Structures are given as C-alpha cells and as structure tokens.
Amino acid sequence: MHYRNLLGYFMLPAMMAVVTIAACAPRQPTEDRVPPSAMKEALSFKAPFGEARTAPPEIVASGKALFEGKGGCYLCHGISGKGDGPAAHMHSTYPPRDFTNCAFQQEREDGELFWIIKNGSPGTGMQSLIPALLSEEEGWKVVAYVRTFCAEQS
C-alpha cells in the first residue's frame, strides 16, 4: 500500500507538469485560429474587390491607413506587421500574428483573415473589430493590406 501512495505522490506532479508545459508551449506561427465549426463560413467570405493579394493600390493604401489608425491593428501587430506592437507584450500566451511570416500568408485564405477581423480569435487577445471599429468593407481593406507584409507572395 505504501508503494501506491508513493507512486501517487510522484505521478500527480509529473502529470501536472506535462499538462502545464503543453499548455504553455509556444503556438505554431501558422496555426489556424478560426474554430473548426466556423471554417466553412470563413471560407465562404469573399472580398468585394476580388482576391486580397491582388487588390488595387488604392484599396491597399486605405487598408494601411485603417491598420495604422482607426482599426488599431498596429497596437498589437506593429507597424511592421511582425506582431511586435506596443501592446504585444500583453498577449504572452497567444502572441499577435507575425504577418511577415510567408508560410502563414500562404496557408490562410482571405476569408479566414476576414473572419478573424469580424469575430475575433477565440482564446486569444484578438477582439472582434466589425462592426465596433470597422465596417465590413474596411475589414476587407485591412485584409488586402495585411497581404502585403509577405514579400514572397505571387
């Protein structure tokens, strides 16, 4: 009986340590933040001006102004889009996206980015910006600007 108690004293802390380490492990920089239950909806969203990667310069410029101004995106994502804005330190568990990560840019569809702007990112510090701060049209312009952070895109 003494052996079982001794084993319990070591196993419980060991199991708790494994769970804690797994929970605190850094998130993958390309990990999807749209919940699986909302993915179909996210993929159905389409920009009114066509694909965000090829948006006209005036749309991108408007998106930049919104990103750096009214939308407040730069506060967490930084002016450079690297996730290094002045408020980024407040999000230690799920840091803001690094939009310069081309793998992330290539793996995510425009509708996924728009869904996050519209609904926020559950379990992270990313809040919904539509309709509180941005209109849907403005949200799409921000997506077009975010797409410019990866210089390797086609």
Map each language-model feature to its residues:
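Gly/Gly-Pro-rich "capping" loops immediately C-terminal to redox-active cysteine motifs
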Residues: 64, 78-110, 114
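Sequence context surrounding c-type heme c attachment/ligation sites in exported
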Residues: 60-74, 107-112, 123, 132-136
